[in-house]
A protein has these predicted regions:
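Phosphate/nucleotide-binding beta-alpha loop and adjacent structural elements of enzyme active sites
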Residues: 1-228
Length: 228
């Protein structure tokens, strides 16, 4: 499909720009929530400074591809479940454009959602049952200080953060997607408040070339204090 090829091209440009910026900042751990096909993993593996990757992808087909690609890499730990507020069973809505698969509720009144369904032929064709755990539960015994947390879960970002209340303070950077459309029933203002309450400040925005969303990089101000 031509549209898919076009958006894959734009995505490559977008991911490359984030990777280039990441060369300027210091971190040792990469936490990739919504690993998809490894777009971030493949780039960030080039950073020798990163000691460990924790990667989460609940889509079973995509997870198998990640395992086949990275199973021999000792720097990478792969997890085949979603992250959210707490441990539970969830449904993942599978889109024919796999990067748009989501656990979030849709706003059926959204004009952008209607546009995607018609023009881009982006439809959630099926659902699968998946396991969900919380960030705090999975990573509580891991050393995640000085980490870069990337969250790209198509409208489910707030849920991920709500499950990280105890350990979010250890993340040095958080990269999170901000959709400009109202296709999901969520509010980015709640995400900003949660991050602000945890001493995170915005330092950089990366706009997708089509300008329908941006990735925002937040910095944990605790790391400005000595001996943290």
């Amino acid at each position: 499909m031509l549209i898919k090829v076009f958006f894959n091209f734009l995505s490559k440009f977008h991911y490359d720009s984030i990777f280039e910026y990441s060369k300027k900042i210091d971190f040792e751990i990469m936490i990739d929530v919504g690993s998809h096909q490894g777009e971030f993993i493949s780039r960030f593996l080039k950073h020798k400074k990163i000691k460990k990757f924790f990667c989460f992808e609940p889509n079973k087909k995509l997870f198998k591809k990640l395992v086949n690609r990275y199973k021999s890499n000792k720097r990478i730990s792969l997890f085949d479940y979603a992250l959210g507020e707490k441990s539970s069973k969830k449904k993942l809505y599978i889109s024919n454009l796999t990067y748009n698969s989501t656990m979030s509720s849709f706003n059926k009144k959204s004009n952008y959602l209607k546009f995607k369904n018609i023009i881009l032929k982006d439809k959630n064709q099926s659902t699968i049952n998946i396991n969900q755990k919380s960030f705090d539960e999975v990573l509580k015994k891991k050393d995640i200080k000085n980490s870069f947390l990337k969250i790209d879960v198509e409208g489910y970002e707030l849920n991920v953060l709500q499950g990280a209340k105890k350990n979010i303070k250890y993340a040095k950077y958080i990269l999170i997607e901000h959709q400009f459309s109202n296709q999901y029933q969520n509010s980015f203002s709640k995400i900003k408040k949660l991050l602000k309450d945890n001493n995170f400040v915005k330092i950089k925005s990366f706009y997708f070339p089509s300008f329908h969303y941006r990735d925002i990089l937040f910095f944990n101000n605790r790391y400005n204090k000595s001996n943290y």
